[in-house]
Curated annotation (Swiss-Prot):
Name of the protein: Tabersonine synthase
UniProt superkingdom: Eukaryota
Tissue specificity: Expressed in leaf epidermis.
Gene Ontology cellular component terms for the protein in this record: cytosol; nucleus
Gene designation: TS
UniProt pathway: Alkaloid biosynthesis
Assembly mode: Interacts with dehydroprecondylocarpine acetate synthase (DPAS).
Length: 320
């Protein structure tokens, strides 16, 4: 084997990293282009917009019947280990468009930089930048587009900023957690905007449990964290991945008043329960809703099945 073929990280069937810096993503869903009036979702439209030189987003708008109506706005962070997939690819896109149709909400799905080409905290910073960009639309009207060319008319016309939500799955839910911690300390748009609530589906944390974890949890979860943030202070006990670590910020400081946390039927459930317990003991004063699905993580994204549709309705009901 030549030196150029020597691997330093191999997690089949998803990703392989070579010693010379090359990255092979072995399993990826296809790109989906922007579209208007999608017939599969009753008229959901989506488009892609730049936010900065390194951050962009896909914005979704459900079919509008009343142009004076204001809709909840959701900022979505996708999962897949901080290092796979995209806001523009079918795996997460298909689910988001169906969620938008069910919840009748605007969604901003953030395209952040991936590891290992861009190690954490790059994705955390990108998602915060995207959230601040969304918040910058508050108080604007359509005439603002003449002078604010970086703003989006769908958000200006239809977003109800009193119903701003975050939403993420797996590592995306981890980004939601860290964004909530940050929003409890730093203001959005100078304090003009507050996050009402957040959905954390299958949140990705590394919290020590008393139960025996599977090889998947022990190896794959920890491997993704090491790949994404190899120099993380504290390693697996870094507060960004372990919210119960000694030096972790107080969960009572979450910058929202409503939370939906969902679990599925695998070994990560024990970790999620410990996270919920820590949140409840923190004294956080918000409304907590827990969805305990007797299913597997990937079933949520198989939108042709009744299982996925029922799970989607449960999560979307939190927004509605």
């Amino acid at each position: 084997m030549g030196s150029s073929d020597e691997t330093i990280f191999d997690l089949p069937p998803y990703i392989k990293v070579f010693k010379d810096g090359r990255v092979e993503r072995l399993h990826s869903s296809p790109y989906v282009p922007p579209s208007l009036n999608d017939p599969e979702t009753g008229g959901v439209s989506w488009k892609d917009v730049p936010i900065s030189s390194v951050v962009s987003a896909r914005i979704y708008l459900p079919k509008i019947n009343n142009h004076d109506e204001k809709l909840p706005i959701i900022v979505y962070f996708h999962g897949a280990g901080f290092c796979l997939e995209s806001a523009f690819k079918s795996f997460f896109h298909t689910y988001v468009k169906h969620f938008v149709a069910e919840a009748k909400a605007i969604a901003v799905s953030v395209e952040f930089r991936l590891a290992p080409e861009n190690h954490l905290p790059a994705a955390y910073e990108d998602c915060w930048e995207a959230l601040q960009w969304v918040a910058s639309h508050v108080g604007l009207d359509i005439s603002s587009l003449k002078t604010c060319i970086d703003k989006d008319p769908w958000i200006i016309n239809y977003a109800d900023f009193d119903r701003l939500y975050l939403w993420g799955d797996s590592t995306g839910a981890n980004i939601v957690h860290n964004t909530l911690i940050r929003s409890g300390k730093e203001k959005l748009n100078g304090g003009k905007v507050k996050i009402l609530g957040a959905i954390l589906y299958y949140p990705y944390f590394l919290i020590r449990t008393s139960s025996k974890q599977s090889d998947y949890m022990e190896n794959e979860y920890r491997s993704y964290w090491k790949l994404a943030y190899p120099d993380a202070p504290g390693g697996n006990d870094n507060p960004m991945i372990n919210p119960t670590a000694e030096n972790a910020p107080d969960l009572a400081g979450y910058g929202c008043s409503r939370l939906l946390i969902s679990m599925v039927a695998d070994e990560a459930r024990d970790i999620t329960l410990l996270y919920i317990d820590a949140l409840e003991k923190s004294g956080w004063k918000g409304e907590l809703d827990v969805a305990d699905f007797d299913k597997q993580y990937f079933e949520l994204f198989e939108m042709e099945t009744e299982v996925a549709k029922n799970m989607l309705r449960r999560l979307a009901s939190f927004i509605k």
